[in-house]
Amino acid sequence: MATAVAGPEIERLIQLLSRLPGLGPRSARRAALHLIKKREALMAPLASALQVAIERIQVCKTCGNIDTQNPCTVCTDPRRDPAIIVVVADVADLWALERAHASNGRYHVLGATLSPLDGVGPQDLTIDALVARAHDPQVSEIVLALNATVDGQTTAHYITDLLMEANVKVTRLAHGVPVGGELDYLDEGTLSAAMRQRTLF
């Protein structure tokens, strides 16, 4: 039987770190040791930042983004085009689009995608709020920026059906050859999507 080599407080730190995505027990142990070694330079500021996050970070009541203000900085930015709402599954997708400067519109975070196998149904997502936003006269386009997975496509079709009565154009991200990609390395599904969505050159 293995014996604990650290005190209960350190074991608790390791246990909590191991709950983070991408950190298994071994990586969590290394991260904990690094934090302890850099106590003043890293652990104290990290603890302070986490406390601020607990106290100040909120979910935007309009789009579902997370921010220290509500509505969030994206929703209140006057330079954003209010006619376009980009629908994403989660906040990480919103941040990815923002890093790429891919959209000047506003966003709507669903919270997940429909997944019957995981027990995620329409009632678990913010689809009703999206439909309500789509009926705003200012809104003219809904961009479905969802993953090219079965769950993502199912969610896109479900939302499209619900938006039939709204006076908006529903578009989705193109799927196909990535920038810098070589055809020989792409899977059949990606190549088929690229051929279907080809554009004039």
From Swiss-Prot:
User: Mind telling me which SUPFAM superfamilies this protein's record contains?
Assistant: Recombination protein RecR
Gene Ontology MF terms in the entry: DNA binding; zinc ion binding
Q: Name one GO biological process term.
A: DNA repair
Q: Cite the residue ranges of zinc fingers (C4-type).
A: 60-75
Q: Which UniProt keywords apply?
A: DNA damage, DNA recombination, DNA repair, Metal-binding, Zinc, Zinc-finger
Q: Does the keyword DNA repair apply?
A: yes
Q: Pfam families under this entry?
A: RecR_C, RecR_HhH, RecR_ZnF, Toprim_4
Task: Name all Toprim domain ranges.
Answer: 83-178
Q: Coiled-coil region(s) at which residues?
A: none
Question: What Gene3D superfamilies does the record tag this protein with?
Answer: 3.40.1360.10, 6.10.250.240, RecR Domain 1
Highest taxon of source = Bacteria
What does the UniProt record say this protein does?
May play a role in DNA repair. It seems to be involved in an RecBC-independent recombinational process of DNA repair. It may act with RecF and RecO.
Q: Which family does it belong to?
A: Belongs to the RecR family.
Which NCBIfam families does this one have? recR
Name of this protein: Recombination protein RecR
Q: What is the lineage of its organism?
A: Bacteria, Pseudomonadati, Pseudomonadota, Alphaproteobacteria, Hyphomicrobiales
Q: Which gene encodes it?
A: recR
